[in-house]
């Protein structure tokens, strides 16, 4: 985006919506979370204006001074859950509910936190780890998009999610 749009006009962030396909044409909504946003260079009033438009549409929005912390916060949960659930072809809750998956997720998150903090973020190890497990519990019946990709023999997001951490670290 920054190649064609001035950085002062770019607003970045993430959102959390869970869904699981039930059958062709039918999806079960499994959760709605917060939409996080901010900017590295855009004026704060532009970010606030965008946030207000999303709030008027019914979304819960949080504007962050350090949006990269919020982006890493969600990425850490994805690092813990998505790859592990795809590898084991399980629902999200298995990551927190199985001692071996729990431990593997801990190691993945710890490594990613080290990379995030080296990139200038200020993430609390214990809080981030607990958040990843909490997401696993809160979305325990969700079949992650990566599991769906494995099931349907499609390319997964592993290079985007865990691969991003590897490229930065």
What role is predicted for each listed range?
Residues 12-15, 66, 128, 161:
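Proline- and acidic/polar-enriched loop/turn elements at helix boundaries
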Residues 45, 55, 106-169:
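NAD(P)-dependent Rossmann-like dehydrogenase/reductase catalytic/cofactor-binding core
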Residues 4-9, 25-125:
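Internal alpha-helical scaffold of NAD(P)-dependent oxidoreductase catalytic cores
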Residues 1-18:
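Rossmann-fold NAD(P)-binding glycine/threonine-rich loop
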Residues 20-24:
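Short, charged, surface-exposed secondary-structure boundary motifs
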């Amino acid at each position: 985006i920054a190649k064609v749009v001035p950085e002062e006009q770019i607003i970045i962030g993430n959102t959390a919506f869970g869904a699981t396909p039930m059958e062709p044409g039918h999806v079960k909504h499994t959760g709605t979370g917060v939409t996080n946003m901010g900017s590295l260079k855009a004026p704060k009033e532009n970010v606030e204006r965008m946030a207000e438009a999303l709030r008027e549409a019914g979304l819960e929005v949080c504007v962050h001074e350090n949006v990269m912390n919020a982006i890493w916060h969600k990425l850490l949960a994805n690092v813990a859950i998505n790859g592990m659930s795809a590898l084991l072809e399980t629902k999200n809750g298995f990551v927190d509910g199985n001692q071996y998956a729990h431990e593997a997720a801990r190691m993945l998150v710890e490594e990613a936190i080290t990379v995030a903090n080296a990139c200038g973020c200020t993430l609390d190890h214990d809080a981030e780890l607990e958040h990843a497990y909490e997401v696993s519990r809160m979305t325990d019946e969700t079949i992650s998009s990566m599991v769906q990709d494995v099931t349907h023999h499609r390319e997964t997001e592993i290079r985007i999610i865990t691969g991003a951490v590897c490229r930065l670290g």
